[in-house]
Amino acid sequence: LPTLIDLCDLVINRFVDFDGISLVPQLKENKLLSEDRILVNAYSRMPGGFEYPSPYGQTLVTKEKSVVLWKEWRLFENRKLYNLKKDPMQTTDVINQRPDVALKMKSHLNDWWNSVKEIANEPQRIVIGSDNENPMMLTACDWMDVFIDKQVQVKRGAEKNGYWLLDVEENGTYEFELRRWPKELDRPLSEPEKGKQFVPLKQARLFINNVLHQDDYLPYSYEGAKIELKPEDKSATFKVDLKKGPIALHTWFDKTRYNTAFGAYYVYVKKL
């Protein structure tokens, strides 16, 4: 970010203690970087094995699952040390041979983690109803904790589901169009990709927290909205009155009554 600020000549009106530095001197003047520069690569893990959301799953960013980069050294997951000059494939752990290097890198990792741990896993909500993007598309890539991030998963109908954390920009009536396939394919919900498994979808459901979807319902029953599907249906559309503020959006496509196949991989949201 400091590099972007300098390149764009942006003015920051308040002090911000950035983790990084501006690389403009290196880009424009070929200046050398300080040998004391240490980087941390911390990223969300793939939710392998998780077919449902869990706030304690392996998608969480943690100190232990980070990589520290310093000159030719790589500290992997706070437990293995590699020398890239001698071992570019990172096959030989030398943490016991160079405890001094490991200690320096671990110290930096601890300091960095203490500075970010309170916000590292804070969800970033997607804004809906903004004039800047209305209508907009949500995809299963943004499900919390579980996500669909490959087209092949959509093609085969991967039996996964999650939910979106959203921020409603303005009070109003919102239209949620649930789809298995993106609009540009113009394909019925149950129609399979050539050579892939047929998934007959009979019902679509939608639930948003703190919203009264039904005027009356049986005790201990599903309280969200639902639509029966026909074989030729390409989408299921729900209209919901929402108030400004945070919400969680849940969707389902069912093979039979509440026998879920997967969530809606694509949802098109429009403030009416």
Task: Identify the function of each model-found stretch.
Residues 1-84, 104, 119, 130-133:
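C-terminal cap/loop subdomain of S1 sulfatases and analogous C-terminal strand-loop tails that border
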Residues 87:
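Intrinsically disordered, low-complexity polar regions and short flexible loop motifs
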Residues 91:
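Flexible lysine-rich "adenylation lid" loop at the C-terminal edge of ANL adenylation domains
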Residues 94-272:
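Long, internal low-complexity/basic segments
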